A protein has these predicted regions:
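Short glycine/threonine-rich catalytic loop with a Thr-x-Gly-x-Asp
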Residues: 194-212
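Ribokinase/PfkB-type carbohydrate-kinase core domain
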Residues: 1-199, 218-220, 226, 231, ...
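Regular secondary-structure segments
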Residues: 213-217, 234
Length: 256
């Protein structure tokens, strides 16, 4: 993170939920990438969103920070069950997941740890790690053309092709239809949970990644882990005007 207000707020938020921050790198050479959606309260008490405000780095990650990131990843690996990678910075090499770091992630995945990746524009460049694209990202990564939103069958085809490309499992999210789990041998559709009422899908992909990660590290198989990802996302999308979270009690409640 940068030595800025956004980095400070992020660290405070992590501490508040009990997350460790001792391995985080703080540097005055970078900004903390931040995506903000200002809200305006209407007369009826409802909130409406204004245009998004983004804070980004416009120059490549310094080499010394890359070196430290890679060193810390290697040290931390021994004490964790899995690694979740969120590569949301679109500008190449301007975020934490640079080309060098991505190569190191492939090595980590080859050491038997469960590594799960979500990447906004480079999902097809990862190797050995499991990846979690949506249907558009999966199709784009393997060069499959389509008109409009990909169908479930197109998502399956894209997922299988992407699994062969990255050399690992692919979890393709397909909106309200749930998820497709793919490997080189085929695809399994894991239906989503039906949700009624108003929803906000922003962050649903992050929620499903967290659900898959928690389930897989707890020993569930790939299909059951995908089902957990669907379940978590089905809860978080119902949180309007707030950060989408899904507690164990909330997950148990929707399963009753």
């Amino acid at each position: 993170v940068g030595k800025d207000g956004e980095g400070f707020e992020l660290k405070c938020g992590l501490v508040d939920v009990g997350a460790r921050t001792d391995a985080m790198i703080e540097s005055g050479e970078v900004f903390t990438p931040t995506y903000m959606k200002p809200l305006v309260k209407e007369g009826n008490g409802r909130f409406s969103e204004m245009s998004r405000l983004d804070i980004k780095n416009r120059k490549p990650m310094p080499r010394d920070i890359e070196d430290e990131l890679i060193d810390r990843l290697k040290v931390l690996l021994a004490g964790v069950d899995g690694v979740a990678v969120s590569d949301q910075v679109q500008e190449r090499n301007c975020g934490v997941i640079t080309d060098r770091v991505r190569d190191e992630i492939a090595g980590l995945a080859g050491e038997g740890k469960f590594v799960l990746v979500d990447s906004r524009v480079r999902i097809g460049e990862f190797r050995r790690a499991a990846v979690k694209p949506n249907s558009f990202e999966a199709a784009r990564a393997v060069g499959l053309g389509f008109d409009g939103e990909p169908t479930l069958e197109q998502a399956k085809s894209a997922g299988v092709a992407l699994a062969e490309k990255v050399g690992s499992t692919v979890f393709v999210t397909v909106g309200a239809q749930g998820m497709v789990v793919c490997d080189g041998g085929g695809a399994v559709h894991v239906p989503g949970r039906m949700v009624e009422g108003e929803i906000d899908i922003v962050g649903a992909g992050d929620s499903s990644l967290a659900g898959i990660m928690a389930a897989r590290c707890s020993g569930l198989d790939l299909v059951d882990s995908a089902a957990m990802g669907n379940l978590v996302a089905s809860v978080t999308v119902t949180k309007i005007g707030e950060t989408g979270t899904a507690s164990p009690d909330e997950l148990r409640a929707v399963c009753d």
